[in-house]
């Protein structure tokens, strides 16, 4: 972990400071070193280190996984932060998701194929919960019958 952080994340962190991400109207582009760092991280298996072998993990104690991942956060939180969010998302599914959700989503998050995210944006609301404008409404008459869980449409700031 320390070697990957030093050799891949540190240079990518600096490159990201110098060469900012940019949007071409369809996709966001990052420096090539960001992709190389993320790929090295995913290949290391540390994203799933505390998971069972059946989920692609190493069955390490959670505290060992957290300590190892601290190298990545220290070397470049902009790149390492994505792993933390993805791991948190996948762990939530492991604790509360159905078997189908775990297979469809968590497995791919732990491998690095999918990424989890945290979307928090209610700029007008601040800490006033009554000012939150985002709404979730059922998506179709059979929204609860989807094997991956109920579907909702979100409107407002996301």
Segments from the language model and where they lie:
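Amphipathic, small/basic residue-rich leader segments at the start of a protein or domain
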Residues: 1-81, 100, 104
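Short, mixed-charge aromatic SLiMs
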Residues: 25-33, 95, 111-117
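Short hydrophobic "helix-edge" motifs at membrane interfaces and signal-peptide entry regions
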Residues: 41-42, 88-89, 146-147
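Glycine-rich, histidine-containing beta strand-loop boundary motifs that form or position
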Residues: 50-53, 81-84, 119-122, 158
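Glycine-rich, Trp-frequent "lid" loop and neighboring beta-strands that shape
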Residues: 58, 100-158
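N-terminal glycine-rich flavin-associated loop
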Residues: 81-99
